[in-house]
């Protein structure tokens, strides 16, 4: 199931997985190149 996190004023929904194959990843977690890792 997708995880929900808040980034600024946006509620982001993304799957835990590599950002390059997951375009629903929040931009904040994509900085670490792996969704869900902040």
Curated annotation (Swiss-Prot):
Keyword Disulfide bond appears in the UniProt entry: yes
GO cellular component, one term: extracellular region
Highest taxon above the source species: Eukaryota
Molecular function GO labels: toxin activity
Proregion residues excised on maturation: 1-5
Residues bearing PTM 4-carboxyglutamate: 10-11, 20, 31
Keywords: Bromination, Cleavage on pair of basic residues, Disulfide bond, Gamma-carboxyglutamic acid, Knottin, Neurotoxin, Secreted, Toxin
Disulfide bonds: 12-26, 19-30, 25-35
Compartment list: Secreted
Tissue: Expressed by the venom duct.
6'-bromotryptophan modification, residue list: 6, 15, 38
Keyword Iron-sulfur: no
Subcellular location, principal: secreted
The record's note on its domains: The presence of a 'disulfide through disulfide knot' structurally defines this protein as a knottin.
Function statement: Induces a sleep-like state in mice.
Other facts noted in the record for this chain: Equilibrates slowly between two distinct conformers. These two conformational states are clearly interconvertible.
Entry's family note: Belongs to the conotoxin O2 superfamily.
Entry protein name: Conotoxin r7a
Organism: Conus radiatus (Rayed cone)
